[in-house]
């Protein structure tokens, strides 16, 4: 009888651990920013000149919808536009959807963007070309960063 109870409890424990593992895996799968930010957020402001000011992570994520033509937006490479990032951003909460064609200038006043893998920033598997200029923005990529000097500052590299 004791053996049967032990076997039953072990089976119950095993089944419970499988259920917990499956739930944990589902919870750990991140949503994409483009599925979460579905309308233009307050942190994405378009000026009269067409240039863009971004003040929060949701505003930066809205670039995905604009460039890739998602969430009711017509695809726009932002050619000739300047994107000014005014605050540090943490993009680690959701997965980034790679940008297709992107032709803008990104400027920041020595701001930092965390949690955005640079290798997934752009969709390099399509025929689009990328022309962009980045100033004063640091991308933190898993304990190291790529720094771009602020406008007017000289780079240490020759």
Task: Briefly describe each language-model feature range.
Residues 26-158:
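Surface-exposed repetitive/solenoidal architectures
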Residues 1-9:
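Bacterial N-terminal signal peptides that target proteins for export
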Residues 19-20, 81:
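Generic detector of short, well-ordered, non-transmembrane alpha-helical segments enriched
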Residues 10-19:
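Bacterial N-terminal signal peptides
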